[in-house]
Swiss-Prot record:
Source lineage: Bacteria, Thermotogati, Thermotogota, Thermotogae, Thermotogales
Region G4, annotated ranges: 284-287
Species annotation: Fervidobacterium nodosum (strain ATCC 35602 / DSM 5306 / Rt17-B1)
Biased amino acid composition, Basic and acidic residues: 64-79
Function: One of the essential components for the initiation of protein synthesis. Protects formylmethionyl-tRNA from spontaneous hydrolysis and promotes its binding to the 30S ribosomal subunits. Also involved in the hydrolysis of GTP during the formation of the 70S ribosomal complex.
GO CC terms, sorted: cytosol
Family, per entry: Belongs to the TRAFAC class translation factor GTPase superfamily. Classic translation factor GTPase family. IF-2 subfamily.
Region (G5): 321-323
Localization terms from the record: Cytoplasm
Protein name, entry field: Translation initiation factor IF-2
GO molecular function, one term: GTPase activity
Annotated InterPro entries: EF-G-like_DII (IPR053905), IF2_II (IPR044145), IF2_N (IPR006847), P-loop_NTPase (IPR027417), Small_GTP-bd (IPR005225), T_Tr_GTP-bd_dom (IPR000795), TF_IF2_bacterial-like (IPR000178), TIF_IF2 (IPR015760)
A Pfam family assignment: IF2_N
Amino acid sequence: MARLRVYELAKQLDMDTKELLHELEELGIEVKSHMSFIDEETVNILLDIYKQTLDEEEDISLAKTREPSKEKTEAKKPPVHITEADLKLDKFAEKIKIPQNRIIQDFFMKGEILKPGQTISISLAKKIAKMYDVRLTFEEDETAVKEQPKLENPLDELKRQFEEIYQNNKDKLVNRPPVVTVMGHVDHGKTTLLDYIRKTRVAEKEEGGITQSVGAYQVIVNGKKITFIDTPGHEVFTEMRARGAQATDIVVLVVAADDGVMPQTIEAYNHAKSANVPIIVAINKIDKANANVDMTKQELVTKLNLIPEDWGGDTIVVPISARNGINVDTLLEMILLVAEMQDIRCIPDSPVRAVTIETRLDKGYGPVANAIVKDGVLKVGDYVVAGKVFGKVKALIDDKGKRLKEAEPSTPVMIVGFEELPDPHSIIYVVDSKEKALEIVEKVREIEARELRKKRQVKLEEILKRMQETEKRELKLILKADTVGSLQALQNAIAKLRTNEIDIDIVHSAVGAINSSDIMLASASEAIILGFRVKADNQASKLAESEGVQIKTYTIIYKLLEDLKAALEGMLEPEEVEEKTGYGEIKKAFKIHKYGNIAGVQMYDGYVDKSGFVRIYRNGALVFEGKIESLKHYQQDVNKVSAPQECGIKFQNFDDIKEGDELEFYIIKKIPRKLTIIEEEKQQI
């Protein structure tokens, strides 16, 4: 038996690749990933061990993982009382005694982004508490934060229900087929690849059936299904994501071996990276005479920072010919491998939701939605809601033209039965009845009408304001410029605006006019668009207005950098500097009934400010440092008294004053902090 990669050994043992990785770690066998090699001797030993005992070990492993959770639920602790002030992630974490970083990491592993110190809702607090088996009670007085059910979008409630279902039913999760989007530069072979896979892998249609465009199709590889979205490119991908309807699990980035990494390749990569979707690179056209796979790999490294696995990285790169089918089977196997490692799952018997790929008015069927089922089993006769539109499923038709009675997770179908045309890329939910569907739709329409003039704006000022709520802040930018030189100079200049408190994330940068793709990426990523010597085309301008994306264009780079620098400086926490204002001495201590002790003070130098602070020294030792409660000059309340005048002072929470005590007065000044741009950068531009 020769040496094997981890995933190859997992296949032989009929084990999950991730499970085998874990087992190898437990055995002290060092492997980095599923692509790591295991030597021949170790392979033989593992085969001897696991071929006989794998089933028993799995049973024991399951028993071990279930037992602690049972004990955990049985050991109930007293509830933690939560007030309005506790509804910040850092304070809430401290209150429930779970490290904030752990909460952020655990939610990130579930695909949810939390930021340090962010404000959290009561429902999110409950969700976090449930994850760690912490019981909560909430403040119920008039100052407590109360959710406003009348203003809440019912679609948000449906979304939360799915989050809770996933949280509370982890034991019911099962693997589902991955949904794949193919991206890449124009003419690099995206459509050719999709067509080849469809022709060679999709089962023959029913006799008399007509191939139906449902926006996606399924193939079977080694007995497992893969769903491909049939519209190549990143435009639909990002439009769906901007509307919260993420359907893609894996991105295949197609790069031509004779052309290398091109502008749209970079653009597509940035879209996928922004969505945190795993990427497999297919280097296409290797059958051409001028194909250069190594050059293409080098450009993947230098332009995209994607290091192929055979070069020591962790990016799966498969050289293929979509026209001739060379290595396409290997690509499909790699998709299944990544799907296994990503642990793509669903709850098949949960309530139903689906993601709309596209909608249209069909001559025969009326308003239809091409969709992919995400959870549950969609059935003919179900009542469905998609945004502000509802309907009853009259027919489900797959990509082979076959009518289905039901559609399982990851199945692409055309849904017939909507009363009106749903918004493209909306999420479809199944509800109990027509009455419930109508209730939801009416509420959504009412909310949309009310909020029509209050549409969310992704503006620099608003993003920076929201950033104040977090400890580590991030400003996302999309940069467009007229030339490569201008773009590089701009990137270098912005890189100098770095600070430990604010990260600048350049989501995407490219040469050329601002287009619709830029707008949708900005909307999905909550980024602003900065253009240097370029403008937005008409379509992009209209889309930016409807999406609430702010575009700022400049012809002078100094102005762009000054605006960005000023905005970032406004977000920096000011530096607190102590400034001494004066000195005095207590000449007399007066005790006033029901009020406390008042110090009769002679000012020797400078002044005392009522809003400032004081240090009291006795025989050279500090006995008090704090605030001034009241300041009087001849019975009059004043804000300031200067030397050589006398005054009466009451110190906040301190009455142990004595004649002869020396006083040092000071104020705290908040000095705005500055960012520094290296001057030579300006000269280069």
